[in-house]
Amino acid sequence: MVRVKVNDRIVEVPPGTSVMDAVFHAGYDVPLFCSEKHLSPIGACRMCLVRIGLPKKGPDGKPLLNEKGEPEIQWQPKLAASCVTAVADGMVVDTLSDVVREAQAGMVEFTLLNHPLDCPTCDKGGACELQDRTVEYGLYEKYYQKGPLELPVYTRFEFTRRHVDKHHPLSPFVILDRERCIHCKRCVRYFEEVPGDEVLDFIERGVHTFIGTMDFGLPSGFSGNITDICPVGALLDLTARFRARNWEMEETPTTCALCPVGCGITADTRSGELLRIRAREVPEVNEIWICDAGRFGHEWADQNRLKTPLVRKEGRLVEATWEEAFLALKEGLKEARGEEVGLYLAHDATLEEGLLASELAKALKTPHLDFQGRTAAPASLFPPASLEDLLQADFALVLGDPTEEAPILHLRLSEFVRDLKPPHRYNHGTPFADLQIKERMPRRTDKMALFAPYRAPLMKWAAIHEVHRPGEEREILLALLGDKEGSEMVAKAKEAWEKAKNPVLILGAGVLQDTVAAERARLLAERKGAKVLAMTPAANARGLEAMGVLPGAKGASWDEPGALYAYYGFVPPEEALKGKRFVVMHLSHLHPLAERYAHVVLPAPTFYEKRGHLVNLEGRVLPLSPAPIENGEAEGALQVLALLAEALGVRPPFRLHLEAQKALKARKVPEAMGRLSFRLKELRPKERKGAFYLRPTMWKAHQAVGKAQEAARAELWAHPETARAEALPEGAQVAVETPFGRVEARVVHREDVPKGHLYLSALGPAAGLRVEGRVLVPAGGEA
């Protein structure tokens, strides 16, 4: 450890620590604009200037001592940027003297010279770092210890301010105000270093310098993070622009349930309306980043909500009270035998809801219990790796597309190939200026092998990569096990896997939907003692499996017919609904299939409004907290399942969240997550074959509202030769019918799609399956 004296305090920090982080560790403050967690420190803004001294040394190399027996300090002639200066043993740092304060105040004034006075209308007002630094470090007498400085408290700039483009949309989600930009370069460094999409840069020189792109748009699935890290109001979220002031919004820390990563998010609401989603720092999971689908795809939560129960009368659904809905439940279920009832939970159902459904299924003795998006092979088949395990690994073998299936894994793999290690944790948390991060760090492409059914974005960082046909995962894994000869790339991956001392295996839906491939993947990991990250289509797959939400030997799965009476926390495929005597749906939005088949539809909260817990792909238990969003009479699945139990004549073991918490603690659920295991012989393999491959996507179909409509639009990918044979011109709008529903999609020609296959996106939890289907023109005729 290195001993550093900051003002009057001595701290010990690891070698390589920046002076800035040593100052924070000592409990003092230093202003900053350009430094940001997880980005390279560059010393661009010069706000973090401090005075640095080192012990004088004699000819013998030993420190010279003063009269008090203390090392004599030689101060550097100029102030230094603390973010790019490393600590040294015996260093003395001064952050409080007038010379330091004067320099910091001068940098504040310099930054404000051309900054517009937009604070009354700027969305960053109240959360602006420039506002805060101006108040804290600007030209104010009270911040100087030796009396007032002889400096004016007004600007000395006597010329016309610079005026540039103020309203420049970079994409449908992000707008740039170039007048407010202070050239800290956070956004440019972010794209270069974190997702690896170099789409922003400085253009022109000198006073004419501005941030821009070569073309309209930010071709990255992680562009929204620049709105969080921008220190001023230069980059803003268009979904929330001009809708509320920062101090008017209520902040709710919760967890995103769109994918199995479980990123920390903050839901900002006002007057019952969800206005904005921001990343919440969870160092072990998403650090300070989230994907664009998680950030911008929230407008559906406020639009066209189902707010009252609906009961079928005279062939159509009509609004009803909860009392009337309960009576309809009792009437519709009065002849139901327990084993005829199916309980099917949504993919983002909480642990508490899963436990109640499991207990209720036991009481009813029904085998029909499942959750939306459950894969043929359970995630709990594999020992879970943590995201920090990935950074400590020496090789990653990926079968799937993390960018679409678990987006934050894309960012973690970016860190992994740059050889970054988890940073040291200080008193103030993650370092603000981590000196191990450099601009334009080379990426070690030999550390990753990636196989996917199309050209995945991460292939640019994998020296070993290959595009394969859907369903060939089992053959690739057989070759990796050494039981079959594979392609040249598979042979290279096998060699790298065998040489690795601490590898991690990452599996996508294509493997998890195939029990043979999954068993081979388990064997591959077991032989090497490797841990696995399983990218399930369901957000809480590990948690619901732990609660026993799985079909019995004769039970029908979530997408199959079977149970005569059924509760659904989602909209299942139409085939699963046919022939049902009584259907209860618990939905946040009314769906055409619910209007056609449901006998009772009950209003449900979205995951933004839920209280409970999820388990992510690491096996980590994560909290959900309810944001105050207007949802009418919506009730959670705990209350609805309890009502269903009473209608069936069964006493529910609990109905309140606190009671569910006690039941979870009694079962020691969090501690048991890592020990849960399955063997595939206990589960029925599913064979699905067809020309349509349901491609996993970051954006989900339900997000296709508001500004997310274009990003979440479904696409039908086809090889150009296949497209010509099927008469599918580039850009055509077609309708596609599959067992999982009808989707309007845009035709996209791609050379990396195998001939004879059609890839369809935006069907969410059905990802990774091969199914039969047909393409129709919008009018209904066959294409």
Swiss-Prot record:
[4Fe-4S] cluster 1 binds at H115, C119, C122, C128. The keyword Membrane applies. It catalyses: a quinone + NADH + 5 H(+)(in) = a quinol + NAD(+) + 4 H(+)(out). GO terms for biological process: ATP synthesis coupled electron transport. Residues 249-305 form the 4Fe-4S Mo/W bis-MGD-type domain. One of its GO terms (cellular component) is plasma membrane. Residues 99-138 form the 4Fe-4S His(Cys)3-ligated-type domain. [4Fe-4S] cluster 3 binds at C256, C259, C263, C291. It holds the Pfam family Fer2_4. Residues 1-99 form the 2Fe-2S ferredoxin-type domain. Its EC number is 7.1.1.-. [2Fe-2S] cluster binds at C34, C45, C48, C83. Binds 1 [2Fe-2S] cluster per subunit. The [2Fe-2S] cluster 1 is referred to as N1b. Binds 3 [4Fe-4S] clusters per subunit. The [4Fe-4S] clusters 2, 3, and 4 are referred to as N5, N4, and N7, respectively. The [4Fe-4S] cluster 4 is too far away from the main redox chain to participate in electron transfer but probably confers structural stability. [4Fe-4S] cluster 2 binds at C181, C184, C187, C230. It is a peripheral membrane protein. Keywords: 2Fe-2S, 4Fe-4S, Cell membrane, Iron, Iron-sulfur, Membrane, Metal-binding, NAD, Quinone, Translocase. InterPro entries: 2Fe-2S_ferredoxin-like_sf, 2Fe-2S_ferredoxin-type, Asp_de-COase-like_dom_sf, Cro/C1-type_HTH, MoPterin_dinucl-bd_dom, Mopterin_OxRdtase, Mopterin_OxRdtase_4Fe-4S_dom, NADH_UbQ_OxRdtase_75kDa_su_CS. It is an enzyme of class 7 (translocase). One of its GO terms (molecular function) is molybdopterin cofactor binding. NDH-1 shuttles electrons from NADH, via FMN and iron-sulfur (Fe-S) centers, to quinones in the respiratory chain. The immediate electron acceptor for the enzyme in this species is menaquinone. Couples the redox reaction to proton translocation (for every two electrons transferred, four hydrogen ions are translocated across the cytoplasmic membrane), and thus conserves the redox energy in a proton gradient required for the synthesis of ATP. The subunit comprises two main parts, an N-terminal [FeFe]-hydrogenase-like domain (residues 1 to 240) that coordinates clusters 1, 2 and 3, and a domain similar to molybdopterin-containing enzymes (residues 241 to 767) whose first subdomain coordinates cluster 4. NDH-1 is composed of 15 different subunits, Nqo1 to Nqo15. The complex has a L-shaped structure, with the hydrophobic arm (subunits Nqo7, Nqo8 and Nqo10 to Nqo14) embedded in the membrane and the hydrophilic peripheral arm (subunits Nqo1 to Nqo6, Nqo9 and Nqo15) protruding into the bacterial cytoplasm. The hydrophilic domain contains all the redox centers. PANTHER family: NADH-UBIQUINONE OXIDOREDUCTASE 75 KDA SUBUNIT, MITOCHONDRIAL, RESPIRATORY NITRATE REDUCTASE. This is NADH-quinone oxidoreductase subunit 3. It comes from Thermus thermophilus (strain ATCC 27634 / DSM 579 / HB8). The lineage of its organism: Bacteria, Thermotogati, Deinococcota, Deinococci, Thermales. The gene is nqo3.
